[in-house]
């Protein structure tokens, strides 16, 4: 084979078993499930794992004779074997063998509380469990349905050297030492890593590490993960197929056909190479025009006099200009330049405006079809309008309430209501995602208390969108509240008193006096809040994750997927970013003119 680096650790999944619930080893998964049902408490599960993740589904797929990608890196998650594996996992969910909407934190909680007899997880869980529970680790068993073993995917951590580093003997020597038996023993004993040295595991010093040895045994029969780009591009469509089947939205065969179509679309050949001559000519013409205008200005005596008079002022702003150039202008220029290229970072190909044409023509498909720029733009606009409406409405009401001088504990309320804004957005997003979990989330628990039915919040666009909005409104209303409270302090009391003397009711005073005086402050805050919300990546990515099937993705999260989950198409993602910038710049300019016109009137 081809040597990419020096391997230092293996990673794969294995079976963690609660010894109090399943004291004996079972040859098949079905036997383990039957044994676990006899002892698990009511509401518990025989097995827990991240069923909607293709990495954790791979052992089931291999047991049915299927593969995620073939030896050439082509998407192979199709056919009868793949469909049978999806149907099998769906049956596990239907028969309450596994929980709904699982994740790593939920698996750990269920296992440690004795509500899950077994979990499928990687070695990291051993460090989290400690001695709080009696458990053992086993290689994954066979499936009685097929008689074949559940072989996990095997990944390898390795030491790599750059081209310059590989030419230095000391770098090669260090890499070899890190992969040696001596260093491997240290990583096993101190780092609890599964080193890829079978002979090392025969050392008597490691005989007591039974759980770690089980991972080493599992790694020996695991399926090595393909190092091709096709493998990287397979995760997203495979995950979506799993989620559709588990939700019951599609039959396995239809979900797999759609997954293959999306993989083909994401990995289709890049646009043909374009000539850079038009770009060079355009940049040259722009440079000449700029130089010509600069020469004309420099030859003007009045301009030279103004420059000499302003030199001291320029000295004060030079550092700020340099910072803006380094942190704003140059990154924007680099992003715009990247959008004109395709291919990998090591072998870029100039394609001109092909990325923009592909985005704006929906890659040759329906302009409002799944994942198109225009459909995602509509979702983004809806997302922005709804959020800003609630931000302003709630912020205005709370700001007015907290500005009443006779309100008791006013300072305490202000601090408490500002806290959602002070907490990092990703922390809040993860907390809200947990609250929207179908089986164990606080929101559904409240619905049950009120006599309602639990809701699968991320199974439909309306509920997933509502979950995202609720999270972002919680994050955003304190900003508007603070703006309103600050603006209210600038309203002269004598104006309000004069309106009251004239017989204006409380509603009339708010509508005809307070609100018009708040508008000059509120409108810029609304524009700023709209820009923030338009690009609110954390909430969309961490709460709904774009579910269901990417329908709640906004433009910035769609750009992220093209950059990092769809074959690393950085040029395509950069074109998305440029279009987002142009939309925001145009919108800000439009509203800026409106603000200027209203201020003048």
Protein language model regions, located:
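Short, solvent-exposed loop/beta-turn-alpha elements that line the ligand-binding surface or hinge
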Residues: 66-86, 142-152
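Glycine-centered hinge/linker elements that transmit conformational signals in sensory
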Residues: 35-36, 72-101, 131
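Short helix-initiation/N-cap motifs at beta->coil->alpha
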Residues: 29-31, 99-113
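Periplasmic solute-binding protein
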Residues: 1-30, 50-71, 153-162, 234-243
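Paired acidic/hydrophobic, glycine-rich loop segments that form the ligand-binding mouth/hinge
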Residues: 117-122, 136-138
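A structural signal for multi-pass alpha-helical bundles of membrane permease subunits
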Residues: 312-601
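C-terminal lobe and pocket-closing loops
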Residues: 127-134, 144-237
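Conserved C-terminal helix/tail region of periplasmic/extracytoplasmic solute-binding proteins
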Residues: 220-290
